[in-house]
């Protein structure tokens, strides 16, 4: 299958300068990037084709060979492949074989264009949310420090009007090969640090980095039902790419703050409801809090501490859809404090009225002490 013209692939004229090439590549790379087109083989092929065209046309030597001889002038150079002379000067000899192996170990992996576009790094932002905001959904503003492309030099690293020069040490390859006896070891060029080019006049804004650091305020929409550990992805809001590569993404990771009343367990909420022994004994009606407001909870007579009551649909609606969870209310018996002498006397009278009566007033207590009595009797010889 014949290859398309590289200028046609990028949609530029043959006399386009590096800035125009980079601009065209950035637009097409973002359009066909695999992250934006998952499981799309056509887009993946387009992305590979665009990247290959950019790799050739941003390398002065390869572009010159391509302009003169077409694809025949650069076949075997674009897209990787460990070129160069082999052991004893022949192509594909022992030196190339061992160079590939040791290149992988020492940071090489074969000769490639050092100016090929590189995607920016992804960033993570930890966002603490109140439970109410996490359940209902909200919009928050966050401040994110990151690197962006330098506007002064358009990410080139060189002062506008100046040019980059081919590295005299690696001759534009970004790597140097060191012969160590029988083996050839490939290492990053110490002069250009793998760039393949040197900057004669660095950009006065970014000092040759091609990127500058800024802190940007972003508005993030938090969907209802988000939970601790959930991540919200903001495309292209990560670190700026290198050599015209697309930016990375920003992942906002949610963490729900502790709540004074409720504990969350997935889509369910839990809370403790204090109750006095009169209501627990005779029954009654209590007001309990929910995230939607107060509701009535009916307490049946003879309710024991620790009993759980379930309020259907008063929990959290899952972020990925589905019915809301429940609110689980655990009744906790509260012992009265700061009683007057008169109140204490009334309680003693009440206690006296229970003494000697049938054990059904305190079945658990009776069962417990009956068990203790039997335990010690069984221990007797």
From Swiss-Prot:
Localization (cell): Cytoplasm
GO BP annotations, alphabetical order: chaperone cofactor-dependent protein refolding; DNA replication; protein refolding; response to heat
Cofactor note: Binds 2 Zn(2+) ions per monomer.
GO molecular function: ATP binding; heat shock protein binding; unfolded protein binding; zinc ion binding
InterPro entries in the cross-refs: DnaJ (IPR012724), DnaJ_C (IPR002939), DnaJ_domain (IPR001623), DnaJ_domain_CS (IPR018253), HSP40/DnaJ_pept-bd (IPR008971), HSP_DnaJ_Cys-rich_dom (IPR001305), HSP_DnaJ_Cys-rich_dom_sf (IPR036410), J_dom_sf (IPR036869)
Swiss-Prot/TrEMBL cofactor(s): Zn(2+)
CXXCXGXG motif repeats: 150-157, 167-174, 189-196, 203-210
UniProt-annotated binding residues for Zn(2+) 2: 167, 170, 189, 192
Entry keywords, A to Z: Chaperone, Cytoplasm, DNA replication, Metal-binding, Repeat, Stress response, Zinc, Zinc-finger
Zinc finger (CR-type) boundaries: 137-215
Residues at which Zn(2+) 1 binds: 150, 153, 203, 206
GO cellular component term of the entry, any: cytoplasm
Job description of the protein: Participates actively in the response to hyperosmotic and heat shock by preventing the aggregation of stress-denatured proteins and by disaggregating proteins, also in an autonomous, DnaK-independent fashion. Unfolded proteins bind initially to DnaJ; upon interaction with the DnaJ-bound protein, DnaK hydrolyzes its bound ATP, resulting in the formation of a stable complex. GrpE releases ADP from DnaK; ATP binding to DnaK triggers the release of the substrate protein, thus completing the reaction cycle.
Free-text note regarding domains: The J domain is necessary and sufficient to stimulate DnaK ATPase activity. Zinc center 1 plays an important role in the autonomous, DnaK-independent chaperone activity of DnaJ. Zinc center 2 is essential for interaction with DnaK and for DnaJ activity.
Record protein name field: Chaperone protein DnaJ
Originating species: Chromohalobacter salexigens (strain ATCC BAA-138 / DSM 3043 / CIP 106854 / NCIMB 13768 / 1H11)
Lineage, uppermost ranks: Bacteria, Pseudomonadati, Pseudomonadota, Gammaproteobacteria, Oceanospirillales
């Amino acid at each position: 299958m014949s290859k398309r013209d590289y200028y046609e692939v990028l949609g530029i004229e043959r006399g386009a300068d590096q800035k125009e090439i980079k601009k065209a590549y950035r637009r097409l790379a973002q359009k066909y990037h695999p992250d934006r087109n998952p499981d799309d083989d056509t887009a993946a092929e387009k992305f590979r084709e665009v990247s290959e065209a950019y790799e050739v046309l941003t390398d002065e030597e390869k572009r010159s060979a391509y302009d003169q001889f077409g694809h025949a002038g650069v076949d075997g150079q674009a897209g990787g492949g460990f070129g160069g002379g082999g052991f004893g000067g022949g192509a594909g000899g022992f030196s190339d074989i061992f160079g590939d192996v040791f290149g992988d170990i020492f940071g090489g992996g074969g000769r490639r264009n050092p100016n090929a576009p590189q995607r920016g790094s992804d960033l993570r932002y930890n966002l603490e949310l109140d439970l109410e905001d996490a359940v209902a959904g909200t919009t928050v503003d966050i401040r994110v420090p990151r690197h962006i492309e330098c506007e002064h030099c358009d990410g080139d690293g060189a002062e506008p009007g100046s040019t980059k020069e081919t590295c005299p040490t690696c001759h534009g390859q970004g790597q140097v090969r060191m012969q160590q006896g029988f083996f050839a070891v490939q290492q990053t060029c110490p002069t250009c640090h793998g760039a393949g080019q040197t900057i004669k006049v660095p950009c006065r804004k970014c000092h040759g980095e091609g990127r500058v650091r800024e802190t940007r305020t972003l508005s993030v929409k938090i969907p209802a039902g988000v939970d601790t550990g959930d991540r919200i992805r903001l495309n292209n809001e990560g670190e700026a790419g290198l050599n015209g590569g697309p930016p990375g993404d920003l992942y906002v990771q949610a963490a729900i703050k502790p709540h004074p009343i409720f504990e969350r367990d997935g889509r369910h909420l839990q809370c403790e409801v204090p109750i006095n022994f009169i209501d627990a004994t005779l029954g009654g009606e209590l007001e309990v809090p929910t995230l939607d407001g107060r509701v009535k909870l009916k307490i049946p007579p003879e309710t024991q501490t620790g009993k759980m009551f379930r309020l259907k649909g008063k929990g959290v609606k899952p972020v990925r859809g589905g019915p809301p969870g429940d609110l689980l209310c655990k009744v906790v018996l509260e012992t009265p404090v700061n009683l007057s002498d008169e109140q204490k006397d009334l309680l003693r009278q009440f206690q006296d009225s229970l003494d000697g009566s049938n054990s059904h007033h305190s079945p658990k207590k009776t069962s417990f002490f009956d068990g203790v009595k039997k335990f010690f009797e069984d221990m007797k010889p």
